[in-house]
């Protein structure tokens, strides 16, 4: 399908109007500079790719979101990171949020209300319950890091909470998913899943890891029944039908994370 030098893919979006048009957030190589990193677009089903969002040799893209009902409007999260033998550099001036108004062909950086210094990993979420709202969880300095909300399609932002995912570090998580029916409800992947029901003003732990594995990395919400959740963890896939009170595990899928 192409982009062999990207090594890590953060997100793939398929244009609902034309499945030959695909946008990719390419994180790029972890252990070296360069490679294929940033935002890419194909108009021929993956036969050829065009780099449309290029920042620098150490900054790739980790997240993409179409504006609900308007795939011409796209939001992208850029992430500067590099691993060395002696440590991991998570963040820098390259990280930030970008917006496209032409389906990912061109981009501009949005900054109003966002942290002004170096930023780390950023997760994005949108909701058809209110297409003007965009959420972002942003790794930054202790004073500026936190959960941000835009009410004007990403043009300006306000900090709602200082909470970001933790555990081994925000770079390990920073995935958020907004309810498709309630614009104030957002789930955040973390060691344990956290949820806000007031647009980020407060967060509470949804589950404690007693009925499922911790280390959550992906969350899906059923638009027809928002109490129905699918969660991807280091131990594989889990499903809940009661908004995270109880989970069942699917042990027959080869999707667990092994460590040595």
Where are these regions (language model features)?
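Beta-propeller blade termini and top-face loops
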Residues: 1-260
């Amino acid at each position: 399908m192409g982009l062999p030098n990207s090594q890590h893919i953060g997100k793939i979006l398929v244009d609902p109007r034309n499945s030959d048009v695909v946008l990719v957030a390419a994180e790029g190589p972890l252990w070296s500079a360069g490679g294929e990193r940033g935002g890419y677009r194909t108009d021929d089903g993956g036969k050829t790719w065009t780099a449309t969002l290029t920042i620098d040799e150490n900054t790739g893209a980790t997240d993409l979101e179409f504006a609900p009902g308007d795939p011409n409007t796209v939001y992208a999260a850029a992430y500067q990171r590099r691993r060395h033998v002696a440590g991991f550099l998570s963040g820098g001036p390259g990280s930030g949020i970008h917006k496209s108004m032409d389906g990912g062909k061109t981009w501009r950086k949005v900054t109003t209300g966002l942290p002004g210094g170096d930023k780390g990993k950023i997760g994005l979420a949108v909701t058809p319950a209110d297409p003007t709202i965009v959420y972002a969880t942003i790794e930054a300095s202790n004073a500026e890091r936190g959960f941000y909300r835009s009410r004007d399609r990403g043009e300006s932002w306000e900090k709602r909470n200082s909470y970001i995912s933790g555990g081994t570090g925000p770079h390990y998580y920073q995935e958020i998913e907004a309810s498709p029916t309630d614009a104030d409800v957002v789930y955040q992947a973390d060691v344990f899943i956290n949820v806000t029901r007031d647009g980020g003003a407060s967060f509470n732990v949804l589950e404690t890891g007693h009925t499922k594995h911790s280390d959550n990395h992906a969350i899906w919400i059923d638009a027809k029944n928002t109490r129905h959740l699918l969660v991807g963890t280091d131990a594989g896939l889990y499903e809940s039908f009661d908004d995270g009170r109880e989970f069942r595990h699917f042990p027959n899928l080869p999707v667990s994370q092994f460590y040595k």
